[in-house]
Amino acid sequence: MDIMRSVVGMVVLLAIAFLLSVNKKSISLRTVGAALLLQIAIGGIMLYFPPGKWAVEQAALGIHKVMSYSDAGSAFIFGSLVGPKMDVLFDGAGFIFAFRVLPAIIFVTALISLLYYIGVMGLLIRILGSIFQKALNISKIESFVAVTTIFLGQNEIPAIVKPFIDRMNRNELFTAICSGMASIAGSMMIGYAGMGVPIDYLLAASLMAIPSGILFARILSTATEPSQVTFENLSFSETPPKSIIEAAANGAMTGLKIAAGVATVVMAFVAIIALINGIIGGVGGWFGFANVSLESIFGYVLAPLAWIMGVDWSDANLAGSLIGQKLAINEFVAYLNFSPYLQTSGTLDVKTIAIISFALCGFANFGSIGVVVGAFSAISPKRAPEIAQLGLRALAAATLSNLMSATIAGFFIGLA
């Protein structure tokens, strides 16, 4: 029954996308079918197929090992505020977001910048981009951007496509925006893992987001124009560093900006949510609903969607609430509120944890529309009106992409 519910959930998400399509007759079944099959295949290999699961587990262990090295830099600055002594002092509650998550973001961003400089990232993106281009029958620029989103966030993508944006057709531009919203950057992945989200789920979600973002981009905005973009040399930075030291330093400074942005937004939004909940609870108290909150409203509204995706009804309210928070606020706040449920074993079953982890794994939220429109418009002012028109539709495509990955994850976890 649970397996069939997951299958129905996939069909429902595809049906929603079809209803939102601007040109239903021009949908490429070749690309859409290949993207869906590839997304399912990636999910199956990484979550169900024993050798694939083993490989993901080993990769997760490796990432955790790399993450542990960030504590050396954190401890040098913050001393005993980082490490097991804090857990002893506060009886297991010594995890301090500012000292554990934010430094990891800075460290990993510097590491990614260094790997770009020595050519590792470029080679990997070229190989994966070529595979996805041929498998999905899409243009080179689309596959290039989609694969790049594994490592870079939606803030960096506009700089990457800057040399080509004026030659990109409307559908390529839409796909680039969708791919950025549907994914997470490598540095942010480490931040989420630092809050207890299983790293193997984050890895699988990042890879599944590549075909999934293209899948829903192609349904909501069908490709009707030939690609005009041709290039030989791909650049990953507007001003390439001159040395490995400069690459690491530039990456660290970029990481600092990201970490500062994350801290600022999280502080502001957590406070705003508390204010809204205070107002809602106060007004609700006049009518006998003193316990009503923004989270509970999201939960009631989106619980049926969470259930059709495969979450047990007993947990559907929580899942719906977190999905709503991710969409209306951002994924970091949603993961922050999800984190306590991950710290206590037995609170949620494995399948529910997987579905929620996948559903929240993406930049698709209303705030991202402003980020994307502002960033892309800055590098191509003449296309600003066109980019603004694509924002809301891209958010819908990216959200459906994340939910599809979550539903597929629930399907394979249910089979295991």
Regions found by a protein language model. Name each.
Residues 1-11, 100, 292-293, 356-366:
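Structural signature of hydrophobic alpha-helical transmembrane segments
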Residues 68-138:
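Hydrophobic alpha-helical hairpins/lids featuring a short glycine-rich hinge
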Residues 126-160, 226-247, 294-298, 326-327:
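Juxtamembrane inter-helical linkers in multi-pass membrane proteins
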